[in-house]
Amino acid sequence: MATLFIADLHLCAEEPAITAGFLRFLAGEARKADALYILGDLFEAWIGDDDPNPLHRQMAAAIKAVSDSGVPCYFIHGNRDFLLGKRFARESGMTLLPEEKVLELYGRRVLIMHGDTLCTDDAGYQAFRAKVHKPWLQTLFLALPLFVRKRIAARMRANSKEANSSKSLAIMDVNQNAVVSAMEKHQVQWLIHGHTHRPAVHELIANQQPAFRVVLGAWHTEGSMVKVTADDVELIHFPF
């Protein structure tokens, strides 16, 4: 058996091939797992659990079917869907996890997270993140009419795209000191995260021992998952 991790699907109506690929994954590989962990940015945007978007209802039903089949499903918020709440989690049968979670997997201690908090060199993004994660601001935003939230979200995505176009790739990647600090804080030798869209397995030193950082890929033209078993930790890419 295996535990599966995915992230950065960025599901939206404009990318039906990704949605179809995810549905096939849920109906196939996910049903064989010990557990499924979604490490953020499942959706391209999330403006509230009350959004009647048909795609959201479709995904809730598909994930719920996996959960009902006996495979526990877990979710860590990403920078795109940090407002996903308890209502959608209940409808989809997912358990919401904190932004950093340590798992005991087949004899390994593994830290999982979305990964945006590791990109500490991007001071502008971190300041924005701190602002939009303020509970009072989230409460205020979610109280706005749905059409207003949609306009705000569209403007924020456009601003983010424009800002990122002028940033260096290095600034938008993780900071190595932040990585080591997180792994040493939690006393782990394994870290699995997404966010950067740069799939790879990195070797480093943490806790004065060899350690590994496994980065999930985004679902653009193919699927990406990390498969953890008693024998191995594999980063796997597969066609939709």
Curated annotation (Swiss-Prot):
Details of cofactor binding: Binds 2 Mn(2+) ions per subunit in a binuclear metal center.
Catalysis performed (reactions): UDP-2-N,3-O-bis[(3R)-3-hydroxytetradecanoyl]-alpha-D-glucosamine + H2O = 2-N,3-O-bis[(3R)-3-hydroxytetradecanoyl]-alpha-D-glucosaminyl 1-phosphate + UMP + 2 H(+)
CDD domains membership: MPP_YbbF-LpxH
GO biological process terms, semicolon-separated: lipid A biosynthetic process
EC code: 3.6.1.54
Known pathway: Glycolipid biosynthesis; lipid IV(A) biosynthesis; lipid IV(A) from (3R)-3-hydroxytetradecanoyl-[acyl-carrier-protein] and UDP-N-acetyl-alpha-D-glucosamine: step 4/6
Job of this protein: Hydrolyzes the pyrophosphate bond of UDP-2,3-diacylglucosamine to yield 2,3-diacylglucosamine 1-phosphate (lipid X) and UMP by catalyzing the attack of water at the alpha-P atom. Involved in the biosynthesis of lipid A, a phosphorylated glycolipid that anchors the lipopolysaccharide to the outer membrane of the cell.
Protein name: UDP-2,3-diacylglucosamine hydrolase
Annotated organism of origin: Escherichia coli O17:K52:H18 (strain UMN026 / ExPEC)
Source taxonomy: Bacteria, Pseudomonadati, Pseudomonadota, Gammaproteobacteria, Enterobacterales
Gene (name only): lpxH
